[in-house]
Structure formats: C-alpha cells, structure tokens
Amino acid sequence: MKFVDEATILVVAGDGGNGCVSFRREKYIPRGGPDGGDGGDGGDVWLEADENLNTLIDYRFEKSFRAERGQNGQSRDCTGKRGKDVTVKVPVGTRVIDQGTGETLGDMTKHGQRLMVGKGGWHGLGNSRFKSSVNRSPRQKTMGTPGDKRDLQLELMLLADVGMLGMPNAGKSTFIRSVSAAKPKVADYPFTTLVPSLGVVRMDNEKSFVVADIPGLIEGAAEGAGLGIRFLKHLERCRVLLHLIDIDPIDGSDPVENARIIVGELEKYSDKLAAKPRWLVFNKIDLMDKAEAEAKAKAIAEAMGWEDKYYLISAASQMGVKDLCWDVMAFIIENPITQAEEAKQPEKVEFMWDDYHRQQLEEQEVEVEDDEEWDEDWDEDDEEGVEFIYKR
C-alpha cells in the first residue's frame, strides 16, 4: 500500500433543527394552547485514532465528511431527532491542523483516542417555550444554528523511540534490518529508501523499543534537493536520534562535511528537533582494521568538535550493534515519555437565554383577553409568525 502522510479533508457538522410553531387541536378543547416542539441538535464530527491504519491514502479520494442535520420540532411537543455523528478514523500519530486558523487541534497518539473537530448546531426552540401568563398563544420560534465547517490538514507522524539520520547510503536501512524484523529495501545506490519505515527492536521478553528509518538527507534538502526534509517530521516524537556516518564513503566525500550537512539541515527544519539528544554512530568499520577505524573516527569527531561519546559499528556484520542497542534501551528507560495532558471532552452545553433574548421577550408582552378567538386556520407557513435567532 502506498505510504501517504499528508491529506486535507473537509468536515461539516450538522445544523440544528428548527423549532416548531403549533397549537393543540382537539375536539371539545377550543383553546388547547401552544404545543410546538424543539428541534434536534446537529450531529458532531469526530476523529478517532486506529492502530490498524498506517497511511492517510484513503483521504486522497474521500475528502468530505458531513454529519446529519437535526430534525425540526413537531406538534404535540415532539422534539426533533438529533442528527447522527460521523466518526473519521485516522492512524495513530496523526496531527490535526485547522487550515483556516493554523491552529493545531490535537495529536492522535493513542489507540481509541477521540477528538471532536466539528460541533453540531444547537436546536431551535418551539413556541411552547414562549408561553407566559401574558402571551398564551405565542407564535415565536427559534431556528437551529449552523454546525461547524472546517478544512483540516492531517499530518501523519510516526511514533518511534529512536530516529535515524544520515546521508544516503550511510547504512540506515541495513542497521534497521540487522536489529529488527523490518525489511526495508537495501541497494548500492542513493535514495533506496523512499518512505519512512519502522522496526521493533526486542532486547528481551520485557524490553523493546521502536526505531524509525527515513530517507537520507543531502545538502540543500531544506530547499527541496533530493527528497527534501518533509520526512523529518516523523522524528519529532523520537526521544533520541542516531546520526549514522559512513566512516569511509565510497564516493570519496568528506565524512566531516557530510555530518555538518545533516546538522545544518536539522537546524533549518526545526530548532526543537536539532536540540534533541543526538548520538554519533560511525558505520562500516568492517571495511578497515580496528585501529584504523578508531583513529579515523577520533579524527572526525575532533574535527566536528564532538565531545560526547560516539560508537563504532558495522550494521552489515553486526559489530558493536548489540552494545549500541543496550545503551539506547537504557537511555529510553531513564527518559520515559512525558505524558501529555489528555484533551478534555467538551461538556454538553444546555441552552440558556442571554440578555438580548430576555429583553426581546419582555418587549413582546401582549395582553390577551379571555374571550379572544384562537387562530384556528394557522399553520407553519403563516407569515405573521416571529422567528428568534440565538447564538452560542
């Protein structure tokens, strides 16, 4: 299946149903009074995280999701039916952005997590709500309010503990193949990896971590060279980055300059990502003897101004790989994920009169005589009825 990590969708919540203007009509009851019911609330639009999904490709074809409108109120104080909600399932790790405002509405990081992205409109009120001692035959009603309408940008960001960085052909895919059951394509040409991939590294029965492999970066990636830097977003949730350096590039390039290019592209993309813990890992040490590899790695680290620990490995022959993985596991255990504050579910808001509507009702006080005749031929199309509009 094609990997798609960005999509745009339109969500439209249901409008609220209108209130009804109606009067009780029954034999031997000449003055039945108002019995117009309220409308129903409009349906909401929800997003739900599903761990069984791993791409947004479905939303390249289906881009519009609309909740059901609330039904209008009816006579005999019958309330309109509430509109049905719509639930849109997205992969775990999806970030939701409102295109109109640029606001991040939420991150779907847990299976089953739900996020309301479109609130249905409020119901309108029927004329029975307006009856009073001075207005026994009200012809007022309120219309339902429109539901929310939004254009949403969905961005899938992989959930991994460890992210891998490096130039093309640095050995990232070979490394993930050697430590996990993932089988990304490996070949002797640049940009063999075209889409991100995940691998689970199991250290024992209880300890494991997830590593993410993304396509390689080259100089000018921030300006669109190569595959660009858009895949770097998949590393934003990683706790540590492994910067793989080919200790002896086959193309004769300078390893120090290659490392600086990666750091520069990271800084151009995001200061936050550039500030993440980053470990230096020299790969392909099996191509030279141990002493030469150690001397070369030391020279490269000094030229970079690197003062922290670095690792020498061979992903192909798994030299030094196990020790590196155990150190990564220890780091992950010592630095657990900080639990983000769970999004609070919006509370159900009951309709409340505001000052404007109270004032309007007070101004509508009309004296009604006991012998006043009821309008027996009235129906909902009567143009003399008054409609009240309210806002949330």
UniProtKB/Swiss-Prot annotation:
GO terms for biological process: ribosome biogenesis. Residues 160-333 form the OBG-type G domain. GO terms for cellular component: cytoplasm. Monomer. It is found in: Cytoplasm. Belongs to the TRAFAC class OBG-HflX-like GTPase superfamily. OBG GTPase family. This is GTPase Obg. Pfam families: GTP1_OBG, MMR_HSR1. PANTHER family: DEVELOPMENTALLY REGULATED GTP-BINDING PROTEIN-RELATED, MITOCHONDRIAL RIBOSOME-ASSOCIATED GTPASE 2. Residues 127-148, 363-392 are annotated as: Disordered. GO terms for molecular function: GTP binding; GTPase activity; magnesium ion binding. The keyword Lipid metabolism does not apply. Its EC number is 3.6.5.-. SUPFAM superfamilies: Obg GTP-binding protein N-terminal domain (SSF82051), P-loop containing nucleoside triphosphate hydrolases (SSF52540). PROSITE patterns: G_OBG, GTP1_OBG, OBG. An essential GTPase which binds GTP, GDP and possibly (p)ppGpp with moderate affinity, with high nucleotide exchange rates and a fairly low GTP hydrolysis rate. Plays a role in control of the cell cycle, stress response, ribosome biogenesis and in those bacteria that undergo differentiation, in morphogenesis control.
